Amino acid sequence: MEAKAVARTIRIAPRKVRLVLDLIRGKEVAEAIAILKLTNKASSPVVEKLLMSALANAEHNYDMNIDSLVVKEAYANEGPTLKRFRPRAQGRASAINKRTSHITIVVADKEVKTSNTEAQEEAK
């Protein structure tokens, strides 16, 4: 079972958000929250809030146990770009692209390895 949360049109470039998401992907939820609290990036509070939202969705909508969840997926896609212009010398202008992100976090139950799957992995 899995639950997800999506934040759309967040005014941080996806390239910068991905740096933070890479830190928490595959981690247990408690560990991911601890990492986000100590990460000094502008997107950390946004990602932390989104992770808490995914946890609330898991608990409320699916009656999942929060203590046994891991961050299954975490990705940032590009949202709409705000195009602005900066005046330059001699009447020219330079384009400024203010990029936005659509951030998605999926939490799921830990996969418990059974002895059968372990035997199959050892056989490979």
Curated annotation (Swiss-Prot):
GO terms for biological process: translation. Keywords: Ribonucleoprotein, Ribosomal protein, RNA-binding, rRNA-binding. GO terms for cellular component: cytosolic large ribosomal subunit. SUPFAM superfamilies: Ribosomal protein L22. The keyword NADP does not apply. GO terms for molecular function: rRNA binding; structural constituent of ribosome. It holds the Pfam family Ribosomal_L22. PROSITE patterns: RIBOSOMAL_L22. The keyword Signal does not apply. Belongs to the universal ribosomal protein uL22 family. This protein binds specifically to 23S rRNA; its binding is stimulated by other ribosomal proteins, e.g. L4, L17, and L20. It is important during the early stages of 50S assembly. It makes multiple contacts with different domains of the 23S rRNA in the assembled 50S subunit and ribosome. The globular domain of the protein is located near the polypeptide exit tunnel on the outside of the subunit, while an extended beta-hairpin is found that lines the wall of the exit tunnel in the center of the 70S ribosome. Part of the 50S ribosomal subunit. This is Large ribosomal subunit protein uL22. It comes from Macrococcus caseolyticus (strain JCSC5402). The gene is rplV.
